[in-house]
Amino acid sequence: MFPGGKMNPRMMKQMQKMMKDFGMDSEDLKAVKVTIELEDKIMVFDKPKVQVMDMMGTKTYTISGRSKNTSKTAEKIEDTEVKVEVTEEDIEMVATQCNVSKEEAKTALEDVNGDLAEAILKLGN
């Protein structure tokens, strides 16, 4: 648009004044992260350059930078809670370590998704 890609500071001020006269205003935002959620994927921009332009009450956002794309199916897998099946061996170990009944040990293991150490700590308190 301009020779050498640079603009005279005086021209820049004139251009900004003209934009304001036409009801246009622009501002650079200090964004750290921008996330755009689409139907099939999520786009994440780290350290983007974000500019907002207000034209007669309508705001337009311009985002530039590199994005990382993540599919939504991967996100759904992470959100799904996995139920761990507690073995009889684990129940006996926790019951013996904490000197509690097998029923108490089984309940504690189910509460912490089969984590032996966490179940022992839970019953120890």
Swiss-Prot record:
Homodimer. Interacts with the ribosome. Binds ribosomal RNA. This is Nascent polypeptide-associated complex protein. The keyword RNA-binding applies. It comes from Methanococcus vannielii (strain ATCC 35089 / DSM 1224 / JCM 13029 / OCM 148 / SB). InterPro entries: NAC-like_UBA (IPR044034), NAC_A/B_dom_sf (IPR038187), NAC_arc (IPR005231), Nas_poly-pep-assoc_cplx_dom (IPR002715), UBA-like_sf (IPR009060). GO terms for molecular function: RNA binding. Belongs to the NAC-alpha family. GO terms for biological process: protein transport. The lineage of its organism: Archaea, Methanobacteriati, Methanobacteriota, Methanomada group, Methanococci. Residues 9-76 form the NAC-A/B domain. Contacts the emerging nascent chain on the ribosome. SMART domains: NAC (SM01407). It comes from the Archaea. CDD domains: UBA_AeNAC. The keyword Transmembrane does not apply.
